Amino acid sequence: MIVCRTRKDAELAFEHLKRIMTKLKLTLNPQKTKIVDMNKESFDFLGFRYQKFGKTKCGRKLPYMMPSKKAMKKVKDAIRVITCRKSAYEGLEQKVEKLNPLIRGWRNYFQHGNSTRRFKQLDEYVWMRLWRRVYYRRKQKKYREHVLYGFRKWYATSGIEYFYYLNKKRYVAVF
């Protein structure tokens, strides 16, 4: 990725890059190589979506770098596989042990962008997947409220890592 102020500068840099690549006997993939005006459109690169929106006091748009939709779908699919019903023989502790390395790696890679909103979404998704597994094991409705109480307590002390709450203690109110 090469960042330039004007389209003319970008085209000059692109031509210079082509010359360097031909000297090295390498080629650029025309489908993946393009010049983009970030004020008008966004683009994905290495799992991040680069986009400008919002405004400063001067009226300029701010650049943002967040996990792409494809990356979000991929991590949700991985979470879904770990927490699926087919692995019902596993306890929640085993699921947490499998989820923690996934969460830690994903968080460490994407923490350098503007990922707060996406991290919160993923924390809610993990909670919902684990809660759903516990909730639907109880068929009788009168027990479900008690199960929720116990699950909140368990989740708060389970040792599961969070996407958003990095190196922070998270307090969960138990009702």
Language-model-detected regions and their locations in the chain:
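Non-catalytic terminal/accessory segments
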Residues: M1-F175
